[in-house]
Amino acid sequence: MSGGAHEYVAAYVNGENNRLIIYGKALINGETKTKNVYEKASRDYYEDNYNANSSKYGDAVYEVSKSGGYYSSWYGDYSHFPDFYGYFFERGSGYSRGAYAGVLAFHYSSGGSTNGYSFCPVLAVL
């Protein structure tokens, strides 16, 4: 089951990037209970950021992957933990991304809008 849409989720790495402020202002200023905020590692690289947040469970990053990068999610789905390239989380991915797409795929995004991106609303009782 690969392809569909790139889906943004309410999660980001708390890094230093103008795009985080430009595209994520509402998310950053939103209530803590409505988002997952990951800390940036001292070396802002996908594997380091992944390891720095390894105790954070509940949003299907660590539950379905064995490392922060390159086809390490279950069933060989692509993974690239957000880093200096982009601090926003993207899930799934569009059919045009080929091997990058997958139900359990996750990777970074700079946060801008483009064709094929969507947001998957989820209602959770808190």
Model-assigned labels for residue ranges:
Residues 15-25:
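A short, polar/charged loop-to-alpha-helix boundary motif
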